[in-house]
Amino acid sequence: MMEPAIEPLDRVFLQLGPITIYWYGVIIGTGVLIGLWLATRESVRRGLPKETFVDLVLFAVPIAIVCARAYYVLFEWDYYSKHLAEIPKIWQGGLAIHGGLIGAVATGAVFAQVRGLPFWKLADIAAPSIILGQAIGRWGNFMNQEAHGGPVSREFLENLYLPDWIINQMYINGQYWHPTFLYESLWNLVGFCLLLWLRRVNLRRGELFLSYVIWYSLGRFWIEGMRTDSLMLAEHLRMAQVMSITLIIIALVLWMVRRAKGWARERYMD
């Protein structure tokens, strides 16, 4: 039995003459602004100047976007080498979170050095904002009908008690697909709540950020295995899964070494 015609949600948020504003950018921008608001509130509570994270974001966000796009293009070079004009078109999607994180962390490290601020203190304050921003940002993938998993039936999606507007948006090219964007968004939302709880536990400085890295990477490894559009390092070897395992190992090693060497004496609340 053929499905009735299902139209996807309009990707365009606003059209101003020749200027097109897409939902993808609006949603990612919303995630950044909410994250900035949360980080600014917490930074003031932790005794930092109110403008600290505003200044950091002015550098970190553009660099993170460039790195996220460069990372994606690098692993899709067979395509982009023949379509160079499409490389700047980030509104079509194609921002790799791992690339963005590398850019953001590197920027944060330089920023902390220049401002004379403790890097791990900044990282801990930023961690809940980052994962909440990721939870929000995945809905940009939803609007673009990307970052989905393998084929499923409509009945499968209905059994997840999803509203029709989500189910219909997962109908792409005559087939329903796993809403992996939603799985990751929910995973990150749980991670956000977990980090807020861990903040009250008063871990040693840096360990809240490392907890974020471990939590996000565990979820990303699991969910990436369902996706159909993964960046591939080699045949049957998904780059995001390799990065997730690598980041988990690095985070655990840093956690243990910093404690063993006495490099993590200060607490989050200090």
From Swiss-Prot:
It is a multi-pass membrane protein. One of its GO terms (molecular function) is phosphatidylglycerol-prolipoprotein diacylglyceryl transferase activity. GO terms for cellular component: plasma membrane. Pathway: Protein modification; lipoprotein biosynthesis (diacylglyceryl transfer). Its EC number is 2.5.1.145. The chain crosses the membrane at residues 19-39, 56-76, 94-114, 206-226, 237-257. Pfam families: LGT (PF01790). Belongs to the Lgt family. This is Phosphatidylglycerol--prolipoprotein diacylglyceryl transferase. It comes from Geobacillus thermodenitrificans (strain NG80-2).
